[in-house]
């Protein structure tokens, strides 16, 4: 498992500057959080990716997604602004600091730290893909990231099948 994680890290770092892979159509496959209430069905941070664009050498990352509230899909677009440490900052349901950690041609693993308006912090992992489920190797990487972020494994939710929002 350590070899897989090291390979994932090396691969991710090698591709970290190749932001062309980030752009395009994406779907949320898996979402995980240390505060399960935030990502359960109807939760404010249960979002369904649709599109990512990068501007100004990816110093600005635009993410379009849906949130389902009261059985209604609500389309939202946010712009994350690159900070000096490789993270992006944006506003949605409070302040968010996010970072793409692992990038392939068909998957992106993001971490996100949300500080809501009440001051509650939620650590998250969001995996976006082109529509395919995680491979066993990608699942191992996800579990390791969850351990590092102190997110219980039982809080990892496969939500691809619950995405009923428009393309």
From Swiss-Prot:
Protein family: Belongs to the calycin superfamily. Lipocalin family.
PROSITE patterns in alphabetical order: LIPOCALIN
Organism: Cricetus cricetus (Black-bellied hamster)
Sites where a glycan is attached: 57, 85
InterPro entries listed in its UniProt record: Calycin (IPR012674), Lipocalin (IPR002345), Lipocalin_CS (IPR022272), Lipocln_cytosolic_FA-bd_dom (IPR000566), OBP-like (IPR002448)
Disulfides per UniProt: 54-58, 73-165
Pfam families: Lipocalin (PF00061)
Positions carrying Pyrrolidone carboxylic acid: 17
Protein known as: Aphrodisin
């Amino acid at each position: 498992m350590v070899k897989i994680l090291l390979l994932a890290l090396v691969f991710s770092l090698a591709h970290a500057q190749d932001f062309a892979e980030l752009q395009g159509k994406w779907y949320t496959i898996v979402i995980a959080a240390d505060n399960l209430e935030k990502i359960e069905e109807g939760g404010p941070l249960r979002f369904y990716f649709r599109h990512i664009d990068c501007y100004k050498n990816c110093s600005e990352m635009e993410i379009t997604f849906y949130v389902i509230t009261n059985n209604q899909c609500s389309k939202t677009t946010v712009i994350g602004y690159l900070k000096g440490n490789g993270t992006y900052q944006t506003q949605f349901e409070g302040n968010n600091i996010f970072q793409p950690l692992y990038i392939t041609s068909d998957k992106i693993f993001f971490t996100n730290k949300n500080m809501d308006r009440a001051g509650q912090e939620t650590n998250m992992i969001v995996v976006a893909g082109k529509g395919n489920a995680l491979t066993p190797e990608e699942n191992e990487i996800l579990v390791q990231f969850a351990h590092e972020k102190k997110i219980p494994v039982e809080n990892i939710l496969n939500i691809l099948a619950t995405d009923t929002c428009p393309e």
